Design a protein with these regions (language model features):
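Amphipathic alpha-helical repeat scaffolds
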Residues: 9-13
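Histidine kinase transmitter module recognition
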Residues: 14-15, 57
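Short histidine/acidic/glycine/proline-rich micro-motifs that form metal-
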Residues: 37-40
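A beta-strand edge to alpha-helix "cap/lid" segment located at domain peripheries
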Residues: 3, 34, 48-116
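Short beta-edge strand/loop motif at the mouth of beta-sheet-based domains
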Residues: 42-46
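Short, well-ordered alpha-helical segments enriched in acidic and aromatic residues
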Residues: 7, 17-30
Length: 116
């Protein structure tokens, strides 16, 4: 397993544990994050503000990763299913694809899209 895949997997593992402080260390001030369900964010501060708000809307949440593949050097593709229970008790489930781009040992970009 390449260092790129290991770092990308670590990002998902930390997300499933809700370890936002540790997740922030994986990004830089020039990292970007784009999601079909959100917006686009620049830098670890903006990314983590978004993630903090996202996580705070759920009692429980997690990503079940079905497939991981380094599609090109430095680019890892995850197929996943997200499941969460909101603070109102609503069950949210969606399948998606997530590209994690790693450069110089940090996450440079995350691109999340719905599978449909």
């Amino acid at each position: 397993m390449t260092d790129t895949v290991q770092l990308a997997k670590k990002y998902f593992e930390l997300s499933n544990k809700g370890k936002l402080t540790e997740i922030k260390k994986l990004f830089t001030s020039s990292s970007t994050y784009s999601s079909a369900n959100k917006d686009i964010f620049l830098g670890s501060d903006q990314i983590m503000d978004m993630q903090t708000k996202f996580f705070s809307g759920f009692d429980t949440l997690g990503w079940n990763v079905h497939n991981i593949k380094e599609v090109k050097p430095g680019i890892v593709l995850f197929d996943f299913t997200f499941t969460g229970i909101t603070l109102d008790g609503e069950v949210v489930q969606r399948s998606g694809k997530e590209y994690v781009i790693v450069y110089n040992g940090k996450i440079q970009h995350v691109e999340v899209s719905n599978k449909d």
